[in-house]
Amino acid sequence: MKSIRSLYKKLLQYVPDKRIWAYSSMALSAAAVCSYMGAYWFLWQSIVSILVIPAYEKAMYDAIIVVALMILRGILNIASATCSHYLGFRLETNLRKNGLHKLLDASSSFFDHNSSGEIRKVIDDNAAETHKTVAHLIPDNITAVMTPVLMFVLMFAIDYRLGILLILTTVIGVLQYRKMSEIGRASCRERV
C-alpha cells in the first residue's frame, strides 16, 4: 500500500495544479459504488415487498429507485473516468515535456550511443503507459476496495446470517486460491 501511495505521490508532482482531478475521480468512484450498493438494497426491498409483504406499490417504487440508482452509477462512473483521464492526459503531456527537458542536459556522448528516435519512442511510450495506468487505476482501485467492504455491510444489514455466510464463503475462496497458487508454483518448479 505504501508503494502505491508513494508512486502516486511521485506522479502527482508532475501535475501539482491538477491533483484535485485525482481526488474528484476517487470521490466520484466511491459515490458510484455507494449508488451501486444502494441499488442492491432497494432491489432487496422490492423483492421483500413482492414476496413477503404483498405491497405492489412499494415494490414498484423500489424498482424505480433501483433503476434511478443504476443510471446514477453509470453517470458517476463516466464522471470519475473523465476526471482521471483529464489528469492522465495532463500527466502524459508533462512527463513528455519533462523528459525532453532532461534530454537537453544530456551529454553529447549519450546521443552517440542512443539514437534520438529511440529516445523519443521510449519517452512517448512510457508517458502513454503512465497515462493509461493513472486514468484507469485510480477509479478501479477505489471500486475494487469499496465494493467488497460495502457488500459485507449490505449483507449484514439485510440479515446477519447472510453476512456470516458471505464471510465463510470468502474465507473458503481465499483458502482455495492459496492452495491453487501453491500447487501452480510447485508444478512450475518441477518443470524448471
Q: Where is each model-derived feature located?
A:
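Cytoplasmic coupling helices
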Residues: 82-101, 142-143, 166-191
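Hydrophobic/aromatic residues in alpha-helical transmembrane segments
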Residues: 39-47, 64, 80, 84, ...
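Residue-level signal for transmembrane alpha-helical positions in Major Facilitator Superfamily
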Residues: 35-42, 76, 80, 92-96, ...
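Residue-level hotspots within the lipid-embedded alpha helices of multi-pass solute transporters
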Residues: 30-37, 70-74, 86-90, 106, ...
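A short amphipathic helical element positioned immediately N-terminal to and/or at the very start
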Residues: 3-22, 118-119, 123
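Hydrophobic alpha-helical transmembrane segments of ABC transporter permease domains
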Residues: 31, 35, 39, 124-168
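Transmembrane helix-loop-helix hairpins at lipid-water interfaces of multipass membrane proteins
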Residues: 16, 22-79, 156-161
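Juxtamembrane loop-to-helix connectors within ABC transporter transmembrane domains
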Residues: 15, 84-85, 104-149
